[in-house]
Amino acid sequence: MTTPHAILEHTFGYNSFRGTQEAVINHLIAGDDVLVLMPTGGGKSLCYQIPALARAGTGVVISPLIALMQDQVSALHELGVRAGFLNSTLSPQEAWQTERALQNGELDLLYVAPERLLQDRMLDLLDNARVALFAIDEAHCVAQWGHDFRADYLKLDILQQRFPDVPRIALTATADVRTRQEIIGRLGLENAQQFISGFDRPNIQYRIQQKNNPRQQLLRFLRDEQKDSAGIVYCLSRNKVEQTAAWLCGEGFNALPYHAGLSASLRAENQRRFLREDSIIMVATIAFGMGIDKPDVRFVAHLDLPKSIEAYYQETGRAGRDGEPATALLLYGLEDVVKLRQMMAGSEGNELFKRQEQQRLQAMLGLCEITSCRRQTLLRYFGDNLDEPCGNCDSCLTPAQTWDATEAVRMALSCVYRTGQRFGANHVIDVLRGSNNEKILNFDHHKLSTYAIGKHLSVDEWRSVFRQLVARGFLDVDASGFGSLLLNDACRPVLRGEQAIQLRRDIKTTATSATRRAPVAVAPEDEGLWFALRACRKRVAEEHGVPPYVIFHDATLREMLEQRPLTPSEMLDISGVGDSKLERFGDEFLEVIREHEYA
């Protein structure tokens, strides 16, 4: 049997394993079941690809990512790995050829969608094939409360019953303790070895800003910091996705929309362009992103509040997979909380489910309003610890100021009470600031004792007060109606003057108030070779019909730039260059280097 180290070096072109990879691989090769939690970019795929090559038979990978299977298989072909996939995109003839290759033992890895795997015909095929292992990718899809839930994942315990001697590995990039237990219970992994890597992504800078003028805030961020960068902008609704993408195009950016309401062909084309072209901004709902391997995504921006810390961590984790500096920007306001609570109130599910959804939203609000290190709070949620503040989030780079808001809070709560707990924040703020608009006059709210008592604070300052009161649980939102603010038991000590309140003072954030660490720059004297290597990669990628990063990551090109290999043996010493890639297109890159070296 070929050793894991030999496969790592000769097939994948790397000299050493990272983190827990080697331990995971050894357990799986030995026939043990394994559960792996590893952050995005941590190298999860090697944890099943190498054992599939080391063990006799075919490694079967169950994945919900139908749209990405072709790229995943193409990437393996470039490495010289015999791989195939089965899903609904194949013609009957193509599917038959792949099934025949499986039966004949001609596949090292087979990617299959869960709904395809669970068909009797497919299970019968696997009965008659030699299966090396089952890899259940994106295992958090088994969690019924998660936005990535796939009903077919609940039936994957059949693998344990029908193939008891075949080892299984379940993998995910994000799972709190509750989701972890759900994965174990539903997939029958009670005896699995668990490998939980740290959740920290130190290269991602986390920033959360009050939403004032979101389009202008996003535009300033893009123009000042992300010129020519690839990134993802998340929006809550399909309509907002399309409007934002069109607006960005009008501002000179190359932006594409992605949501479940678009045709399958347009989604596939936009995804293909995002993966293959430079400087594309994908504007999307949460329907986009799972399994996206593009390493050079420099930013993820949220124009609406995610429903949970799990969703936020997973979506922001799509930035900076190459380890280079990246930014996660979230713009959030009180209207986000109202909208999400209304959506949750109207969602399917019993009261327990809805209560758990509200608790997850409350945890997300806590992350938004925290005045200490955001990364420490984020990691603590997943049971991970960071001893010192990170120095790479907005709270660390621009420490939050607080102010004694006790009197302002009492004014706010009193005005909610005086207006009958029937209105949203905008109307209550108008009353506090003494507006004489038609709505106030119609309801006689200009006659209230709280009318015009809050002129000393601006509209934005009052919005900050109400946002923080809702986030900290001093006010409730009537989710079933029009977002009216409601008093609760927690606010009574404040109204009675028994409790003082400190609130965060929102900062008018500019792009320079948080320090952006730029990706490693190329020295001026190296720029000619750098651009020539990138041009060579793009040309080879187009010839092979794959995204450029499938040929070589930027880190590999950067090492070529530093080491200047001139022979095949020297090229093999470059991290990311294995035997197959050297044979297929190593000469083209060597020729580029030689031309510049001897020029």
Model regions and ranges:
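Accessory DNA-binding and partner-docking regions appended to nucleic-acid-acting proteins
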Residues: 1-7, 356-358, 387-599
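Flexible coil/turn residues that form the inter-helical turn or adjacent wing/linker of helix-turn-helix
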Residues: 164, 227, 371, 421, ...
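Helicase motor core with emphasis on the C-terminal RecA-like subdomain
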Residues: 2-11, 15-19, 23-45, 53-55, ...
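Short helix-to-turn junction characteristic of helix-turn-helix DNA-binding domains
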Residues: 28, 222, 274, 368, ...
